């Protein structure tokens, strides 16, 4: 299965289907982008979008989402889990989401106002994608990975800094309403690269591998702080930046 919907189509399918997105959904990022897109388009663009959806059989006579697409919109707006990987490189960027769908996962690429969904895929495919994105980021780029579910929100930004692999991590516990911040500059070894990959995919928690001394944390944090400008460029949240500053100063 593979199909593409633009953001306006997704907006209208959500509205006519009566769906509201939760705090796990990719719509937390897509909805603001959609509103920004609408502001630069003709005022009748939504009615034109409705006509296109009806003509293509995506909606019925009452503009309700047809059954096949309705299941996708429901999964998109109210997933139980969501994994996002955003890779920024000098020659471009990619923004990919994974959500559960029909007993497996959907891989969705968000680009230029369109969402291309493909699947079903296994979670192993998602992990392999993140590992490949990490390899690219540690060559010449910045990778931001976010995992969201009903209990927590886990965010990580990784890049290749001058003195090591700069790692910014935050874990927000929804029940306790508390956020914990992790920051470290890893030595540039293959073992550390594998360890970081496992933290990104959730196979490991935020922990240091053997060979990375916790007593070096303060020095490590100071080295990572030099890359704070990079973190800002990839929209790492202000709370993380403040927490990092407090931890180092």
Regions found by a protein language model. Give the residues of each.
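Non-catalytic recognition/regulatory regions in large multidomain proteins
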Residues: 7, 23, 63-241, 245
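Short, amphipathic alpha-helical interface elements at domain boundaries
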Residues: 1-51, 68
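A short, conserved structural fragment
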Residues: 51-62
């Amino acid at each position: 299965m593979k199909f593409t919907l633009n953001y306006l189509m997704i907006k209208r399918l959500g509205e006519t289907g009566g769906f509201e997105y939760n705090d796990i959904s990719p719509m937390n990022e897509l909805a603001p982008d959609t509103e920004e897109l609408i502001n630069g388009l003709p005022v009748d663009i939504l009615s034109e979008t409705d006509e296109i959806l009806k003509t293509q059989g995506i909606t019925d006579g009452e503009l309700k989402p047809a059954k096949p697409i309705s299941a996708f919109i429901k999964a998109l707006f109210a997933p139980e889990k969501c994994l996002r990987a955003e890779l920024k490189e000098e020659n471009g960027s990619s923004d990919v989401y994974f959500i559960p769908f029909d007993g497996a996962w959907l891989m969705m690429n968000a680009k230029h106002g369109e969402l291309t969904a493909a699947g079903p895929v296994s979670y192993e495919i998602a992990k392999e994608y993140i590992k490949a994105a990490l390899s690219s980021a540690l060559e010449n780029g910045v990778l931001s990975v976010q995992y969201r579910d009903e209990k927590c929100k886990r965010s990580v930004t990784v890049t290749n800094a001058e003195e090591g692999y700069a790692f910014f991590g935050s874990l927000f516990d929804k029940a306790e309403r508390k956020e914990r911040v992790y920051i470290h500059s890893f030595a540039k070894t293959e073992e550390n690269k594998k360890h970081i990959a496992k933290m990104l995919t959730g196979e490991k928690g935020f922990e240091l591998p053997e060979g990375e001394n916790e007593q070096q944390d303060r020095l490590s944090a100071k080295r990572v702080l030099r890359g704070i400008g990079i973190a800002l460029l990839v929209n790492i949240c202000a709370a993380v930046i403040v927490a990092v500053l407090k931890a180092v100063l």
